[in-house]
């Protein structure tokens, strides 16, 4: 669903969004044929199917030009929520509405084909993110220069390190010039010099009244960059509000849990 892109409009609106996944138990050493037979059996035997709710009844909105942080423990639903925002997943219930074009930079290399070269992946990702062939050609040199991968651009992606993946993925995403930029732990990989270059480009993006959604375990980064934040806990939204308030509440709970664990041990 798309929202109007007028200057006073909200950039993102989620209403009662839920997403669940079926739990499938496959023996560790099952053959491919055994796996297919097992999946077909489970599909037919619907009454015995088990599901896990990765995101449960989440509602919030983000204003245009705001930066939203998403925090929570591992397994709390952060990555699933980002994939819902990106349109990779469709919600089982509720609605996700975005104003304008989105550039998702989620799990590193998620949209890259490992057997394609960096050059080929720039073209494919540019098309996926909405650029025309002419626009990709026009921005190609800038993307390569920003990624600092000139020497490796004709190597297959499977030869890239995780840092190199991030360099190229960020360079493509930021040069698409989107209205909404989704970033999932992207600055946790790579050297500090490149991370600083990414932060400078993010600042320019933010100053241009664009919207950013940022997942990070770095509380300092959430405080520095984000206007508001969402705290997810087992798929549910525990808190939504000013970033500093949400981070403080999250850290208080972590501190209490740590003290309780120490007493038990």
Task: Please tell me what each predicted stretch does.
Residues 224-231:
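Conserved catalytic segment of ABC-fold P-loop ATPases
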Residues 234-235, 250:
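Conserved ABC ATPase "signature" C-loop
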Residues 1-54, 243-264:
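Pre-NBD coupling/linker segments of ABC/ABC-like ATPases
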Residues 216-217:
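H-loop/switch region of ABC-family ATPase nucleotide-binding domains
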